[in-house]
From Swiss-Prot:
It holds the Pfam family Methyltransf_5. The gene is rsmH. One of its GO terms (biological process) is rRNA base methylation. Keywords: Cytoplasm, Methyltransferase, rRNA processing, S-adenosyl-L-methionine, Transferase. This is Ribosomal RNA small subunit methyltransferase H. One of its GO terms (molecular function) is rRNA (cytosine-N4-)-methyltransferase activity. GO terms for cellular component: cytoplasm. Specifically methylates the N4 position of cytidine in position 1402 (C1402) of 16S rRNA. S-adenosyl-L-methionine binds at residues 35-37, 55, 84, 105, 112.
Amino acid sequence: MTKEFHHVTVLLHETVDMLDIKPNGIYVDATLGGSGHSAYLLSKLSEQGHLYCFDQDQKAIDNAQVTLKSYIDKGQVTFIKDNFRHLKARLTALGVDEIDGILYDLGVSSPQLDERERGFSYNQDAPLDMRMDRQAPLTAYDVVNTYPFNDLVKIFFKYGEDKFSKQIARKIEQARAIKPIETTTELAELIKAAKPAKELKKKGHPAKQIFQAIRIEVNDELGAADESIQDAMELLALDGRISVITFHSLEDRLTKQLFKEASTVDVPKGLPFIPEDMKPTFELVSRKPILPSQEELAANNRAHSAKLRVAKKIRK
């Protein structure tokens, strides 16, 4: 891993081991990031196995080309710079219509958080950006300065689950009428000013939920995850597995719902048997989400909210 792209991988062994790797299999890392999961997965493949890695951040791919060089030299890795919502189309274009396993590590990678100018962090002063893909048109600046009041309230409440969404949106509306809100610090101060004093004494940064909401909106994170996970489940071969790491309740709820729909069947009462086309196509590998160990939590503070869910395809 290069110094410029330092990232501590969360739930490394659990995420990959639960995929039950076949040495000659075809696998996908939908969220390359710091390439930790990819490196561990590749170590389990034979030279006949192959890994396709997606990331919309060129820096992640540049870093992986250094850290995974030995596997690249053997022709075991293909990098795809794109949003994982286009996963099915991009794999199909490469002649891949079936995979043995796929993993997702959702959310923002450490290097993106730590790179001040990306504007993801409320702890560092930077221009309001928050784009995972630096070529994408919509920025956090656009959301904060151009979205109507009602739209701000909606995304703050829906994606940030912040009960002071209206007050924060009103404070933003008042401030931007005087001059544009340009930096993360300006925005964080406005959020603080909109909240009651007793709220500011609570654990955690008062701007955390609103920054999350804006980031999700800028990158359409939930829409992309929904599309991509459904496509991935279609692409999986029989006995293929999918591992998904989430970092907040919205992502976890989405993953849990998609897995539940595929692993349960809703049949009318009194039906003597379940028709073949109504039987579940997946089963849950673990009934409850897998959480980081105490050792991992002690070593990596960013692992605290991580949850891993795994499902296996049992019927085509």
